[in-house]
């Protein structure tokens, strides 16, 4: 059995660890609320631009059809935008979305896909794709706690341009959707080509005045819509990250508290045994006299 001094040292070490995890839990809770606010603030813009894109894409103003709306007869070349975190200590968040991405890539390979290109948002996903030997054409890391579209759109645009130029037949995005504080869901969604289901049904019949012309307006609107989808995915993932980290750190703090209690019990028993032994020795010595 360990000595009382060794047990006290262990208790002190676990107490220090608990202080750290408790502080990280509180920081994550604060960041989670801010991330949720950003996520909710982005939703009205994404919904409004979706409605405009739906109306414009189905308006009979021109025979022109944007590349983002063209469905390919056969999908042989696939792009994947993988959204993960830059840091760990967030439970199984990254592991779950990486598993979804890996299963998707295996499925595409089994269906005869000849090429898979990846764009990684987040350090964890970038490292994962490198370990898997995937073809990573672009990546962005260290987005910080406040994602900016200007920083992430460069790497994402490489993927969008590849689709628009006919180098890819479909583009998917994998991220963790925020459900609530205790639940986050890893999802894989088709980003391109845009489907009628994704855009939704136009609200009535719309007539617009186009400046300078319909093609320019449609081109710009659809690109902005896809960018909004990517930003929303990143915002959802960041809210999920902070929620998962808060829960993970709370679990770590609770476990540390239990360990401290168990060690304290062992220490008390050790101290009691030592006192009993000393008393026995004193009594034995007195009896001998």
From Swiss-Prot:
Disulfide cysteine pairs (residue numbers): none
Gene Ontology annotations for the cellular component aspect, listed alphabetically: plasma membrane; proton-transporting ATP synthase complex
Membrane topology field: Peripheral membrane protein
Record GO terms (molecular function): ATP binding; proton-transporting ATP synthase activity, rotational mechanism
Residue intervals passing through the bilayer: none
PROSITE patterns registered for this protein in UniProt: ATPASE_GAMMA
Compartments (UniProt record): Cell inner membrane
Any Gene Ontology biological process: proton motive force-driven plasma membrane ATP synthesis
Keywords per UniProt: ATP synthesis, Cell inner membrane, Cell membrane, CF(1), Hydrogen ion transport, Ion transport, Membrane, Transport
Stored HAMAP family: ATP_synth_gamma_bact (MF_00815)
Subunit structure comment from the entry: F-type ATPases have 2 components, CF(1) - the catalytic core - and CF(0) - the membrane proton channel. CF(1) has five subunits: alpha(3), beta(3), gamma(1), delta(1), epsilon(1). CF(0) has three main subunits: a, b and c.
NCBIfam families: ATPsyn_F1gamma (TIGR01146), PRK05621.1-1 (NF004144)
Family in the record: Belongs to the ATPase gamma chain family.
Primary role: Produces ATP from ADP in the presence of a proton gradient across the membrane. The gamma chain is believed to be important in regulating ATPase activity and the flow of protons through the CF(0) complex.
Protein's name in the database: ATP synthase gamma chain
Protein species of origin: Aromatoleum aromaticum (strain DSM 19018 / LMG 30748 / EbN1)
Lineage, highest ranks first: Bacteria, Pseudomonadati, Pseudomonadota, Betaproteobacteria, Rhodocyclales
Primary gene name: atpG
